[in-house]
Swiss-Prot record:
Involved in transcriptional activation and repression of select genes by chromatin remodeling (alteration of DNA-nucleosome topology). Component of SWI/SNF chromatin remodeling complexes that carry out key enzymatic activities, changing chromatin structure by altering DNA-histone contacts within a nucleosome in an ATP-dependent manner. Required for maximal ATPase activity of SMARCA4/BRG1/BAF190A and for association of the SMARCA4/BRG1/BAF190A containing remodeling complex BAF with chromatin/nuclear matrix. Disulfide bonds: none annotated. The lineage of its organism: Eukaryota, Metazoa, Chordata, Craniata, Vertebrata. The gene is Actl6a. InterPro entries: Actin (IPR004000), Actin_CS (IPR004001), ATPase_NBD (IPR043129). Keywords: Acetylation, Activator, Chromatin regulator, DNA damage, DNA recombination, DNA repair, Growth regulation, Isopeptide bond, Neurogenesis, Nucleus, Phosphoprotein, Transcription, Transcription regulation, Ubl conjugation. This is Actin-like protein 6A. It comes from Mus musculus (Mouse). The modification N-acetylserine is found at S2. Its main location: nucleus. GO terms for cellular component: brahma complex; chromatin; GBAF complex; Ino80 complex; kinetochore; npBAF complex; NuA4 histone acetyltransferase complex; nuclear matrix.
Length: 429
């Protein structure tokens, strides 16, 4: 075995699972990540005269470069000229400087230990490109000089977290909903089906609803004080006096935080295809916005998530050919070899934060059982706890990196030095 033995339990391998919405990181062998903070980060570019803003809790980039504000607390402070950006696009790293800032921050503030002491297992999108994988490998070995590295596809890790090596992973996160077939721990690339209808899409739908209802979205950072008002009456709040000139992207990010809270508290998927009459009978949910305005939401709380299952229902997308969630699953299975289909239908694993909308799995189960051929046994695997569903690929990574049998799988520093960054293609399927 090359490059020295790494005993998974003793070394304390680190597991990074960087998604489009949050970053999850922590030690292998633990049952949940140590940190979970937004992937969106604040960036203040340099002023013309070369001076930046006051340095308090920012992470300075390269000399004279931008200042990054990472983690919930630093990001949510209003600052002049701070843009909110995300290093990822389509689940893959796009902006390497800000991606590196996230890693630096995690090592400095949360791991609080030398990067060179811990092997790293990192999750990646199943469609990650070869060039990006090699660049990431190079970054980890050259810049952080870690002792060993491994890249694993998110879907495979999710399957492992649920004790399976074969199954169909339905992952609905922030930017996309995907069905990914996994067989014996390998992703079947030809069967991947993606749809852009996911968490961010629901956020957009909520935004449109608020515009129709004339509800003004006021993020908490603007509010100095507010008074309790009767249901449905106009809000009575005072604006903060000295607010800096914030950028549009950052203000948007703060508004989205409010909407995401609304999404989690109010929305529900209807049990069967959306029907005005049935929806009107459903109990309403009371919600209060940060500025004190409050009202009840009835049918609309079922109408918004309906777009996930029945895209023809969504206004503004008429004539679209997008697939609903259950179609994504059946299409994906249909693209796989006929012999392995029973194994896929037999463990459809639901993961991702967007699937936590109330009754999501019930509706999916119902639709799939109507679409599954009678010869197949359908089994839907969905953890009930938020943690396991949001962190499923991190948990899978934690299990994998601490297995004794996995220890010969690492790309060791020695192998990297001998074989270069190409070894990631060979060692990490």
């Amino acid at each position: 075995m090359s490059g020295g033995v790494y005993g998974g339990d003793e070394v304390g391998a680190l597991v990074f699972d960087i998604g489009s919405y949050t970053v999850r990181a922590g030690y292998a062998g633990e049952d949940c990540p140590k940190v979970d903070f937004p992937t969106a980060i604040g960036v203040v570019l340099e002023r013309d005269d070369g001076s930046t803003m006051m340095e308090i809790d920012g992470d300075k980039g390269k000399q004279g470069g931008p200042t990054y504000y990472i983690d919930t607390n630093a990001l949510r402070v209003p600052r002049e000229n701070m843009e909110a950006i995300s290093p990822l696009k389509n689940g893959m790293v796009e902006d390497w400087d800000s991606f590196q800032a996230i890693l630096d921050h995690t090592y400095k503030m949360h791991v609080k230990s030398e990067a060179s002491l811990h092997p790293v297992l990192m999750s990646e999108a199943p469609w990650n490109t070869r060039a990006k994988r090699e660049k990431l490998t190079e970054l980890m070995f050259e810049h952080y000089s870690i002792p060993a590295f491994f890249l694993c596809k998110t879907a495979v890790l999710t399957a492992f977290a649920n004790g399976r090596s074969t199954g169909l992973i339905l992952d609905s996160g922030a930017t996309h909903t995907t069905a990914i077939p996994v067989h014996d721990g390998y992703v079947l690339q030809q069967g991947i089906v993606k749809s852009p209808l996911a968490g961010d899409f629901i956020t957009m739908q909520c935004r449109e609803l608020f515009q129709e209802m004339n509800i003004e979205l006021i993020p908490p950072y603007m509010i100095a004080s507010k008074e309790a008002v009767r249901e449905g009456s106009p809000a009575n709040w005072k604006r903060k006096e000295k607010l800096p000139q914030v950028t549009r992207s950052w203000h948007n990010y703060m508004c989205n935080c409010v909407i995401q809270d609304f999404q989690a508290s109010v929305l529900q998927v209807s049990d069967s295809t959306y029907d005005e009459q049935v929806a009107a009978q459903m109990p309403t949910v009371h919600y209060e916005f940060p500025n004190g305005y409050n009202c009840d939401f009835g049918a609309e709380r079922l109408k918004i998530p309906e777009g996930l299952f029945d895209p023809s229902n969504v206004k503004g997308l008429s004539g679209n050919t997008m697939l609903g969630v259950s179609h994504v699953v059946t299409t994906s299975v249909g693209m796989c070899d006929i012999d392995i289909r029973p194994g896929l239908y037999g463990s459809v694993i639901v993961a991702g934060g967007n699937t936590l909308i109330q009754s999501f799995t019930d509706r999916l189960n119902r639709e799939l059982s109507q679409k599954t051929p009678p010869s197949m046994r359908l089994k839907l695997i969905a953890n009930n706890t938020t943690v396991e569903r949001r962190f499923s690929s991190w948990i899978g990574g934690s299990i994998l990196a601490s297995l004794g049998t996995f220890q010969q799988m690492w790309i060791s520093k020695q192998e990297y030095e001998e074989g270069g960054k190409q070894c990631v293609e060979r060692k990490c399927p």
